[in-house]
C-alpha cells in the first residue's frame, strides 16, 4: 500500500497502446468497493512544479496502475543494444533501446560538434540514439534522460540480464559482446510461456549419435538386425497366442443355456440389420424345454422393435416411447446390444418433451388470444350501444332546439304586443 506523500509512478497510455510511467505523488488513499484507490498528482521526472499545470491535476487510479519509484542506479555509460527507459517530452518514462552512442563537444562559438568516437575534455557530453520500442522512432537523448530498464515483479525490482552483464564485465569483453548480440530481440520484460530448452541428456545423446565412428555404426547395424529377427519371432508367437485366446474366448461367448435345434437360427443370424450375439444367460432360470423358443422369440422381437422405433411419429405418446425403451432394457439383460436404439429413443423423448412443452405454450397463447378477442367483441358491443345512445341524444337535442326556437318566436310576439299596447292612442 502507498501512504500519502509517497513518490510513485503511475501508468498512462499513449495512443491506447504504449504504456508509459509518469512520476507522481500520492495525495490520498481510500477504499471503494473493497478495492484500494489512490488520488495522485503527476509531476515531471524531477518532481518539479514547472510545466503544464493541466498535466499536474489530481487523478484517481487503482493499485494496479501504481508502482514505487525504481531505485537509482549510477551508470557511467550505457552499452549498445541495451534496453533502457527514457523520459521523452514530459510524457513519462518510455521503453527503448540504445542504438548509437555519440559525444557532443561545445565549441567556443557555441556550435555543437558530434563525433562517433570518444572525445576527451570537460566540454564533451554523451548522447544516445534510442529506438523507442512502441513507435520504432530513433531519438537523441542526453544521459540524464536515461535510466536502466527495471521490472517490478512480485513486489521486487528486478534488473534485466543485459544491464547485469554490463555491470560485471568490461565493455570490450568478447563474452559480454556475445551476450549483447544474443539479446537483440524484444526485451524480456515478462517471461514468455511455452518456451523450453531441451534436456541436457537429450542434447548429449544427439551429439553422440552424430559423432559415432563408422565401425561402431556397423556393429550397431548388426545388433539392430539381430533385434529385428528376434522381434519377428516374438510377433509370430504373439499372433499364435492371440489366435488361441480368440478361439477360447469365442467358445466361451457362444456357450448358451440351450442347444440350437431349430433351423430358423440360420435365418436369424444372417440378418444384417444390427448383428447381435446375445448370451441368453437369464434363461437358465426358466424351464429347459422353453429356453430355445424364448430365445427365438427375442431374436424375432429385436428387429421388430427396431422397425417400430423407425416408424415413430411426432404425435406418439411419451408412454409409448418409454414402453419401447423398457422392452430394449429387457433384451439388454440377455446380451443384446441396444445402445444405438436406446440413444435414439432418449433423443426422441427429449424432442417429445420439448414438443409437449411447446404445445402447452401454444395452448396458453391461444387461450390469451381467445380472451383478448372476447374483450374486443365486448368493446365493440359497447361501442354500438354508445352509438345508439348518441343517436337518441342527438334526436332529443334536435327537439330541444326546435322547442327553443318556438319559444323565442313567442317571446318576440309578446314583446311586439307589449309595444303596440303601450303606444296605442288614448
Curated annotation (Swiss-Prot):
Residue ranges with Polar residues bias: 164-184, 213-222
Main location: nucleus
Coiled-coil spans in chain: 370-402
InterPro entries the UniProt entry points to: Agenet-like_dom, Agenet_dom_plant, DUF724
Chain segments carrying region Disordered: 164-248
Tissues of expression: Expressed in flowers.
Compartment(s): Nucleus
One term under GO cellular component: nucleus
Ranges of biased composition (kind: Basic and acidic residues): 223-242
Keywords, alphabetical: Coiled coil, Growth regulation, Nucleus, Transport
Keyword Flavoprotein: no
Residue ranges of domain DUF724 in the record: 256-425
Function description: May be involved in the polar growth of plant cells via transportation of RNAs.
PANTHER family in alphabetical order: AGENET DOMAIN-CONTAINING PROTEIN-RELATED (PTHR31917), DUF724 DOMAIN-CONTAINING PROTEIN 1-RELATED (PTHR31917:SF50)
Protein name per Swiss-Prot or TrEMBL: DUF724 domain-containing protein 9
Gene label: DUF9
Amino acid at each position: 500500500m502507498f501512504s500519502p506523500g509517497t513518490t510513485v509512478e503511475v501508468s498512462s497510455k499513449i495512443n491506447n497502446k504504449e504504456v508509459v510511467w509518469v512520476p507522481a505523488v500520492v495525495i490520498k488513499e481510500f477504499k471503494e468497493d473493497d478495492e484500494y484507490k489512490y488520488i495522485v498528482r503527476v509531476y515531471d521526472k524531477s518532481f518539479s512544479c514547472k510545466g503544464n499545470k493541466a498535466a499536474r491535476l489530481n487523478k484517481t487510479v487503482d493499485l494496479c496502475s501504481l508502482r514505487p519509484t525504481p531505485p537509482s542506479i549510477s551508470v557511467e555509460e550505457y552499452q549498445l543494444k541495451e534496453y533502457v527507459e527514457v523520459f521523452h517530452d514530459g510524457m513519462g518514462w518510455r521503453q527503448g533501446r540504445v542504438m548509437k552512442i555519440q559525444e557532443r563537444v561545445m565549441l567556443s562559438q557555441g556550435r555543437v560538434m558530434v563525433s562517433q568516437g570518444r572525445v576527451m575534455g570537460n566540454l564533451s557530453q554523451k548522447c544516445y540514439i534510442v529506438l523507442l520500442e512502441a513507435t520504432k522512432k530513433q531519438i537523441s537523448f542526453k544521459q540524464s534522460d536515461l535510466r536502466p530498464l527495471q521490472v517490478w515483479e512480485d513486489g521486487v525490482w528486478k534488473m534485466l540480464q543485459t544491464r547485469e552483464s554490463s555491470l560485471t564485465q568490461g565493455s570490450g569483453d568478447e563474452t559480454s559482446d556475445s551476450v549483447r548480440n544474443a539479446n537483440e530481440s524484444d526485451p524480456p520484460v515478462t517471461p514468455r510461456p511455452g518456451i523450453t530448452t531441451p534436456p541436457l541428456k537429450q542434447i548429449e545423446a544427439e551429439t553422440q549419435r552424430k559423432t559415432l565412428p563408422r565401425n561402431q555404426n556397423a556393429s550397431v547395424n548388426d545388433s539392430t538386425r539381430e533385434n529385428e529377427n528376434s522381434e519377428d519371432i516374438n510377433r509370430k508367437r504373439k499372433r499364435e497366442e492371440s489366435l488361441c485366446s480368440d478361439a477360447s474366448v469365442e467358445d466361451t461367448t457362444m456357450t448358451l443355456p440351450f442347444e440350437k435345434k431349430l433351423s430358423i437360427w440360420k435365418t436369424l443370424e444372417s440378418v444384417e440389420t444390427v448383428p447381435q450375439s446375445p448370451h441368453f444367460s437369464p434363461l437358465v432360470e426358466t424351464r429347459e424345454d422353453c429356453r430355445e423358443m424364448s430365445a427365438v422369440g427375442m431374436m424375432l422381437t429385436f428387429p421388430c422393435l427396431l422397425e417400430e422405433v423407425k416408424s415413430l411419429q411426432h404425435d406418439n405418446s411419451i408412454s409409448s416411447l418409454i414402453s419401447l425403451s423398457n422392452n430394449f432394457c429387457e433384451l439388454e439383460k440377455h446380451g443384446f446390444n441396444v445402445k444405438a436404439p436406446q440413444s435414439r429413443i432418449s433423443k426422441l423423448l427429449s424432442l417429445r418433451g420439448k414438443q409437449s412443452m411447446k404445445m402447452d405454450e401454444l395452448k396458453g397463447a391461444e387461450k390469451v388470444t381467445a380472451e383478448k378477442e372476447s374483450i374486443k367483441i365486448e368493446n365493440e358491443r359497447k361501442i354500438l350501444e354508445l352509438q345508439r345512445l348518441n343517436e337518441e341524444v342527438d334526436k332529443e337535442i334536435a327537439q330541444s332546439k326546435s322547442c327553443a326556437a318556438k319559444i323565442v318566436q313567442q317571446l318576440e310576439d309578446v314583446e311586439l304586443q307589449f309595444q303596440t299596447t303601450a303606444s296605442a292612442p288614448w
